[in-house]
Design a protein with these regions (language model features):
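Short, surface-exposed acidic/glycine-rich loop or hinge patches that mediate macromolecular interfaces
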Residues: 38-39, 103, 140
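A C-terminal functional module that forms or caps the active site or interfaces directly
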Residues: 103-111, 120
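Domain-level signal for soluble alpha/beta catalytic cores
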Residues: 5, 103-104, 128, 137
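Solvent-exposed, flexible loop/coil residues
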Residues: 17, 106-107, 131, 137
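Catalytic alpha/beta core domains of metabolic enzymes, predominantly
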Residues: 1-91, 95-98
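Beta-strand/loop-dominated core regions that host nucleotide or nucleotide-derived cofactor-binding catalytic loops
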Residues: 121-127, 132-154
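Short, well-ordered beta-strand core segments
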Residues: 115-116
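Conserved, mostly hydrophobic/aromatic
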Residues: 22, 67, 101, 109, ...
């Protein structure tokens, strides 16, 4: 599909809207994007792979599930999401849930491979699938504990 967009976000939105529905409905299983604007080839490739992953046709990167945070979130959710993404972006095929609280977190991340869920003021619990494997970890070291859990499971 060919686009004529100058802005990355406009290109991504239009490409996803045009191609995503066809893929979800099973009418195609591949994608070729082109752009007549100034969008770099790397962005075009990343967009195509992102659409394929969203349609569950090809996994090419780590996937993250997160809540927007609310009054029950007792740690810096945005900063934590950024830290976890940076530390795990190379783990192709994993799905990691990052949730603000214990109330809705475990249910919202039910299909994640690993979960990072707020447990109290600056405390976090870690999950493997839907099973809590470590409780009330201080937030300052919780990302390292998550990475250690993932590494231990690789062995």
């Amino acid at each position: 599909y060919q686009h004529s967009k100058e802005e990355k976000s406009d290109f991504q939105l239009e490409a996803a809207a045009d191609m995503g529905a066809l893929m979800i409905d099973g009418l195609t299983d591949g994608i070729w994007l082109m752009n007549n604007g100034d969008i770099p080839a790397q962005t075009i490739d990343e967009t195509a792979f992102g659409i394929l992953q969203a349609a569950r046709l090809r996994t090419s990167k780590t996937e993250y599930i997160s809540c927007p945070g609310c009054g029950r979130t007792l740690y810096d959710l945005r900063e934590t999401i950024a830290k976890i993404k940076e530390a795990t972006k190379h783990l192709k095929g994993l799905k990691i849930g990052i949730m603000g609280c214990i109330v809705n977190g475990p249910g919202e991340m039910a299909d994640a491979d690993y979960g990072y869920v707020g447990a109290g003021p600056n405390k976090v619990s870690l999950y493997r699938k839907q099973v809590c494997v470590e409780k009330n970890i201080p937030q300052e070291v919780a990302v390292e504990h998550l990475l250690a859990l993932i590494d231990a499971d690789k062995k």
